[in-house]
């Protein structure tokens, strides 16, 4: 009777149209229910039965209903699934496979099956790559995934590395070597092999890509020659090797080992500036005045050099600091070290007055055993030899930025524009509330930004510095020149690490075109997108492996009385994020660990403070003592508790 009834169809359509709908992102909880967060402002309750249709992180459209004075969201349409490609662990039960995604808020096993090409016999605990293929909001009965790749078994000691690389879809191996010979016969090279070039690196470094030589001009100035390894002499543009390097974009440095951008025979041998080996290079010569100014006589050329010594950071630093456990091999090398130290001091003073100098932060290096276990974490402070190399490389990159800008008008530039114009008023308000008057428009200029940074660096704590960082833009990679506010420089283009960075290889080719007077093509914008994306993925991979190793390292300390000094690096509504200064690990302190009565404690990201009953007890950048309360190995989270 009601079949094909137009009135009934009209009524259904009317009800459907009148039902309120919202679009948002599903937030799961450990208790089965969830919330639909809309624009970060409002959230709606999703009951457990409805949560079975969705997954944490899904973007959906939901209908809104009222139940006992509470608005409830009922998932209706999938806009964008949270999971597409992911990694997880296999569960095997009676020949039936399921996979638990490796994510802190995804605990439920998902039915899965291997794709036809995958012949591996899966066992409990295996790590795999999977692709979601079914979703309840797409009309399927349940979630289902296809297993697309086997990563490793659950007992592999190197799980942190292999799983992380698979998660971010990054290479595990060095590229294969192909037949390579010098291919730039038309490029005239000066013979500088008689000069006393030296390299300064870590003791374990094999891919030495920069060598330095200084000549004292006798009038208080120096002529600095920076020689940079020349892989583009072997790698033809658009060749198989070049396309591989372009895809990888960077050498991927992970705790314990690296995955190079170029084949190891190139990066660690043919191109590496090994001592007493003749190597093709690009060189930059520039006069540096006694005050540290770069003169206008910048000159780039191609050359042959022969490094006379592979020096090590700690050896050089010890010798310059008067510790004579190590000595330079001869007076010529000793003279080079002494002259490089003078250049470093002059350039550092110039940058402090006219640009910006980053505050020294230690590096943390994992000392690993044969099975990937963390034996120790070494704190490596930046010493004078590190600063020598840093000052010379910054000078070289400024020279390239200016030369490319003047001769070509393009290149691969590192650009940082300081404050976001949309947020600069907020930054000025935060500064004013903390006793610093700043004109928002002046903050958007390079001199204004530098003046503020110098003022903040002179303050006794980093509280204000950390508070205004969120109003700043991120550094970008650009094909056109632009300022680098973070360094306080009007232009910055790197070319000093072409073995490790594809953008530097691009700049090498442009510099060669400039040297020979040939026509040069502006790099495609797609290259900057690829470089930025790969840089992001490599950083995430380094962080993820680090988190895993920190969790392993700190697990024995959980629940003990061992104290750690920590710096508060972030304050969120739920608690504090701190960095342990002894080893670099990041831990979370939940708000209830700060004060038992939850309503009396306010953790505010806005003010960068924690207040108990209206009194400020902690501020961002404070140093506090903590103990490790718990290490959650499945999520690699370290939970800490303040020492009372």
UniProtKB/Swiss-Prot annotation:
Cross-referenced InterPro entries: CSD (IPR011129), NA-bd_OB-fold (IPR012340), RNase_B_OB_dom (IPR013223), RNase_II (IPR011804), RNase_II/R (IPR001900), RNase_II/R_CS (IPR022966), RNase_II/RNase_R (IPR004476), RNR_Ribonuclease (IPR050180)
Main location: cytoplasm
Keyword Protein transport annotated: no
Enzyme class: hydrolase
PROSITE patterns in UniProt: RIBONUCLEASE_II
GO cellular component assignments: cytosol
Keyword annotations of the record: Cytoplasm, Exonuclease, Hydrolase, Nuclease, RNA-binding
Subcellular compartments: Cytoplasm
Biological processes, Gene Ontology terms: mRNA catabolic process
Its biological purpose: Involved in mRNA degradation. Hydrolyzes single-stranded polyribonucleotides processively in the 3' to 5' direction.
HAMAP family noted in UniProt: RNase_II
The protein, known as: Exoribonuclease 2
Organism of derivation: Yersinia pseudotuberculosis serotype IB (strain PB1/+)
Lineage of source species: Bacteria, Pseudomonadati, Pseudomonadota, Gammaproteobacteria, Enterobacterales
């Amino acid at each position: 009777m009601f079949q094909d009834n137009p009135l009934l169809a009209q009524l259904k359509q009317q009800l459907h149209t009148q039902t309120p709908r919202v679009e948002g992102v599903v937030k799961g909880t450990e208790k089965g229910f969830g919330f639909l967060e809309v624009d970060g402002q409002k959230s709606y309750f999703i009951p457990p039965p409805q949560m079975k249709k969705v997954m944490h992180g899904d973007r959906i459209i939901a209908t809104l209903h009222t139940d006992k004075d509470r608005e409830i969201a009922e998932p209706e349409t999938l806009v964008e699934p949270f999971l597409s490609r992911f990694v997880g662990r296999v569960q095997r039960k009676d020949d039936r496979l399921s996979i638990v995604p490796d994510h802190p808020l995804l605990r439920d096993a998902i039915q899965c099956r291997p794709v036809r090409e995958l012949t591996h016999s899966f066992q409990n605990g295996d790590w795999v790559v999977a692709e979601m293929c079914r979703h309840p909001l797409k009309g399927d009965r349940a979630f289902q995934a296809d297993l697309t790749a086997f990563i490793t078994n659950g007992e592999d000691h190197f799980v942190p590395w292999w799983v992380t690389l698979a998660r971010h879809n990054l290479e595990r191996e060095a590229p294969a070597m192909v037949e390579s010979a010098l291919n730039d016969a038309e490029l005239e090279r000066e013979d500088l092999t008689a000069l006393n070039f030296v390299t300064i690196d870590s003791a374990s470094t094999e891919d030495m890509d920069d060598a330095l030589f200084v000549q004292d001009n006798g009038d208080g100035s120096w002529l600095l020659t920076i020689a940079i390894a020349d892989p583009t002499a072997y790698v033809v543009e658009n060749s198989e090797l070049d396309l591989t390097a372009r895809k990888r974009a960077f050498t991927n440095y992970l705790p314990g080992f690296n995955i190079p951008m170029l084949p190891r025979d190139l990066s660690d041998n043919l191109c590496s500036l090994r001592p007493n080996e003749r190597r093709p290079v690009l060189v930059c010569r520039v006069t540096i005045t006694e005050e540290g100014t770069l003169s206008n006589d910048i000159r780039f050329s191609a050359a042959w050099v022969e490094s006379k010594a592979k020096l090590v950071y700690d050896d050089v630093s010890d010798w310059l600091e008067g510790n004579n456990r190590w000595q330079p091999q001869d007076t010529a090398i000793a003279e080079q070290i002494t002259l490089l130290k003078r250049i470093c001091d002059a350039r550092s003073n110039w940058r402090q007055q006219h640009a910006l100098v980053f505050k020294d932060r230690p590096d943390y290096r994992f000392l690993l055993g044969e099975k990937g276990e963390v034996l120790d974490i070494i704190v490596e402070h930046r010493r004078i030899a590190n600063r020598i190399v840093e000052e010379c490389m910054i000078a070289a990159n400024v020279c390239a930025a200016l030369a490319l800008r003047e001769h070509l008008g393009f290149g691969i530039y590192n650009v940082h524009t300081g404050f976001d114009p949309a947020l600069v008023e907020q930054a000025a308000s935060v500064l004013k509330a903390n006793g610093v008057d700043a004109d928002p428009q002046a903050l958007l200029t390079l001199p204004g930004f530098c003046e503020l940074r110098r003022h903040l660096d002179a303050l006794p704590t980093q509280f204000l510095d950390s508070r205004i960082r969120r109003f700043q833009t991120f550094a970008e990679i650009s094909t056109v020149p632009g300022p680098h506010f973070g360094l306080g420089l009007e232009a910055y283009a790197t070319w000093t690490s072409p073995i490790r960075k594809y953008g530097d290889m691009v700049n090498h080719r442009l510099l060669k075109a400039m040297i020979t007077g040939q026509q040069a093509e502006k790099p495609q914008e797609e290259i900057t997108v690829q470089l930025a994306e790969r840089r992001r993925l490599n950083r995430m991979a380094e962080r993820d492996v680090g988190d895993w190793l920190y969790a392993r390292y700190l697990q024995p300390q959980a629940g003990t009385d061992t104290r750690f000094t920590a710096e508060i690096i972030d304050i969120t509504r739920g608690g504090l994020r701190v960095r342990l200064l002894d080893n670099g690990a990041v831990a979370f302190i939940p708000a209830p660990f700060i004060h038992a009565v939850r309503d009396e404690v306010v953790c505010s990201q806005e003010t960068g403070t924690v207040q108990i009953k209206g009194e400020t007890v902690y501020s961002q950048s404070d140093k506090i003592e903590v103990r490790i309360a718990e290490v959650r190995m499945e999520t690699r989270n370290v939970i800490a508790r303040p020492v009372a």
